[in-house]
């Protein structure tokens, strides 16, 4: 936010400008701390023979307060402006927010489960995290995160809901969960825009759970919002790795850094005898990462508790135990690559 000293540009203020500032100083700052002039929200006030102009800095204010504050300012200015044209613009310092795309070449590899648990693990580590369910045609984050509540809106912006310390939005919260979405590419891309451009406040990192494959939604995200990095999830089997390679190729073509590969469903321990089997193979993702020159972030075993936790709406990372520690370590590895 601009400081009070910098906010009042120009050393010589006319009496009319002083009157304008006095009128604006009667408006209480929405933060509850002083008025909008002393808080430095009034920038470059100027009164000429034909116009009254100023900028209003709304940095740090909830979007729901912007329109009411603008109305108050316009009303105050009208008393000074007379027949002059009023020129008022709102401005804000946008919080730098890093997008981490979580993708896969094909469905069924546990990408959404991994995305949700990474988001929760990062939130538990003290990060301010947002989670966007960009899997428009098959949104599963409301179930995994246990949050089907429909989000409110302020003006044209959605207001994310919070679950397990993570702000989240999903198209699954906005439509009937039992109805198919027969949307063409432009409609899906527009839906993604509504989710990404929501009022995320001071969110530092946004985890975006992408649809499987390399379609319109992926292209929209990569072209318009340029993720800081991408994480690709795959099972060890060759079929998944072939498709994962296509996702990696897309990220590279769009100049999005690959933070690393995660091997999911890596080994199954029999709950009765403890013997470990590898229904999807073993070590394939780590080998592929080495071959492609990509960092291997780690592996997650095929464990019934991870599946049941997601079905129950409480991601494993929100609990304590060995599996939660795995996601905590994965989150640390991703942050190390990102930084």
Give names to the regions the model predicted.
Residues 218-239:
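Inter-motif core of Ras-like GTPase G domains
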Residues 122-183, 189-190, 196:
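Phosphate-binding loop that captures ATP/GTP phosphates
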Residues 98-135, 248, 252:
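Walker A/P-loop phosphate-binding motif and the immediately C-terminal alpha-helix
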Residues 169, 210, 329:
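Glycine-rich phosphate-binding loops of nucleotide-dependent enzymes
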Residues 38-104:
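Extreme N-terminal, non-catalytic leader segments
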Residues 172-186, 193-220:
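Switch II (G3) loop of P-loop NTPases
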Residues 15-17, 39, 58-64, 68-71, ...:
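C-terminal lobe/tail of nucleotide-utilizing enzymes
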Residues 8-9, 13-43:
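N-proximal, solvent-exposed amphipathic alpha-helical segments enriched in charged/polar residues
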């Amino acid at each position: 936010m601009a400081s009070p000293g910098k906010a009042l540009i120009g050393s010589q203020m006319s009496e009319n400008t002083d009157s304008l500032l006095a009128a604006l100083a009667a408006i209480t700052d929405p933060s509850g701390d002083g008025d909008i002039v002393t808080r430095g929200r009034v920038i470059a006030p100027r009164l000429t023979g034909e116009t009254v102009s100023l900028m209003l800095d709304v940095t740090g204010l909830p979007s729901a307060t912007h329109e009411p504050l603008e109305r108050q300012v316009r009303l105050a200015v009208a008393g000074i402006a007379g027949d002059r044209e009023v020129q008022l613009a709102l401005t804000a310092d946008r919080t730098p927010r890093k997008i981490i795309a979580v993708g896969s070449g094909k469905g069924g590899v546990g990408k959404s489960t991994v995305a949700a648990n990474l988001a929760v693990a990062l939130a538990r580590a003290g990060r301010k995290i947002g989670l966007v369910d960009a899997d428009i045609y098959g949104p599963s984050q409301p179930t995994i995160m246990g949050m089907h509540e429909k989000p409110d809106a302020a003006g044209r912006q959605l207001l994310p809901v919070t679950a397990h310390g993570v702000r989240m939005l999903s198209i699954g919260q906005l439509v009937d969960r039992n109805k198919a979405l027969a949307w063409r590419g432009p409609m899906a891309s527009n839906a993604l825009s509504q989710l990404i451009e929501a009022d995320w406040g001071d969110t530092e990192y946004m985890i975006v759970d992408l649809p499987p494959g390399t379609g319109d939604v992926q292209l929209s995200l990569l072209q318009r919002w340029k993720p800081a990095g991408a994480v690709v999830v795959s099972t060890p089997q060759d079929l998944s790795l072939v498709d994962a390679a296509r996702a990696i190729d897309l990220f590279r073509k769009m100049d999005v850094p690959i933070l690393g590969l995660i091997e999911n469903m890596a080994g199954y321990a029999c709950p009765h005898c403890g013997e470990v089997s590898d229904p999807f193979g073993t070590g394939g993702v780590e080998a592929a990462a080495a071959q492609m020159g990509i960092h291997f972030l780690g592996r997650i075993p095929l464990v019934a508790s991870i599946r049941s936790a997601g079905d129950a709406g409480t991601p494993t990372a929100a609990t304590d135990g060995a599996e939660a520690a795995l996601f905590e370590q994965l989150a640390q590895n991703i942050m190390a690559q990102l930084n």
